[in-house]
């Protein structure tokens, strides 16, 4: 017998029982995005490798260790996208969407990173991202955060996420801070682990979010990034904080929050949770005013975020068990007896015409009434429509409320109206 071929480690199948809750969560997210006037953009999952090297930064874990990169048959270096912002910016430049324009965009889909698979972190994972172009004030930063806060309320998880904020200033301010931080780290080099020693000269700000407890203790005495901010960045951050306070959104300023990608400036933020074991990031983003120009476009202010859907689904399931998937089926059509199947299928098509949006499944494969009602229960149907030989002969159907057990014989022409009343 041939050996079974299994999924690649860290790249998961999502089965019907799981995709149902994903669909409900994604529907909730998309409804909120629509209420803010954001438009979907669909992007390739494969891009030219230099796009990510230029956008993310060559001296980052993503580029150095995690990207899935390969040569195609033409010898071009291609990469499965590890994140969505770079591709969105590339598309905006390529199609003339950005210069002297405002765009509020969102995208959803799989991303790929070669990481050690663990709960909520996989090699193929799914993100929903938002990107706004052409607006440079703190008000749009605040709107994005307010949008995410509305998501948490709609999903019933507001009490389980907290907002952390920081400003990492301008490029010049970060360069000055980088020099001060490197000088401090050099004085305490013996207390750094090997990873931090490597980052100290290549990407020293990444030392700030080291997970090593000893390094975190050392950083208590390090220079503070906030002390090196330029005045414009200070005013921008103060404006953002004031807007969030006016909106009733609580936050904590975390001066060690820097984000893992090189393109950020000024505002950075993360929504974090402790409800999945160790602290985990649910949603993160910030401002990246230099990235469009860095990738070949005209200078354009920009801000955005990305959210990992696997982790969000886990969080919703962990803290809000009342948030359940919608049933697969609203109505199950039961048919038993000689020559009833064609009549049942014809009635089903008529009901689908008259009740758009209602999910109706017709029984196939035969079976007595008991077996068919068991199938209706399995699929979560609220109502059964029953056709037997006598109903076909009389032009009627029996409509049964599967919750109360009440059933009524109804003329087939009136079945849709009766169902509309039952289903609300």
Swiss-Prot record:
Localization: Cytoplasm
Pfam families with a match to the protein in the record: HGTP_anticodon (PF03129), tRNA-synt_His (PF13393)
Group of enzyme by EC: ligase
Recorded superkingdom: Bacteria
Catalytic reaction equation(s): tRNA(His) + L-histidine + ATP = L-histidyl-tRNA(His) + AMP + diphosphate + H(+)
PROSITE patterns xref list: AA_TRNA_LIGASE_II
Entry-linked InterPro entries: aa-tRNA-synth_II, aa-tRNA-synth_II/BPL/LPL, Anticodon-bd, Anticodon-bd_dom_sf, His-tRNA-ligase, HisRS-like_core, HisRS/HisZ, HisRS_anticodon
Listed EC numbers: 6.1.1.21
GO cellular component, one term: cytoplasm
Gene Ontology process terms (BP): histidyl-tRNA aminoacylation
NCBIfam families: hisS
HAMAP family: His_tRNA_synth
UniProt family annotation: Belongs to the class-II aminoacyl-tRNA synthetase family.
Protein name (Swiss-Prot/TrEMBL): Histidine--tRNA ligase
Taxonomic lineage of the native organism: Bacteria, Pseudomonadati, Pseudomonadota, Gammaproteobacteria, Enterobacterales
Gene: hisS
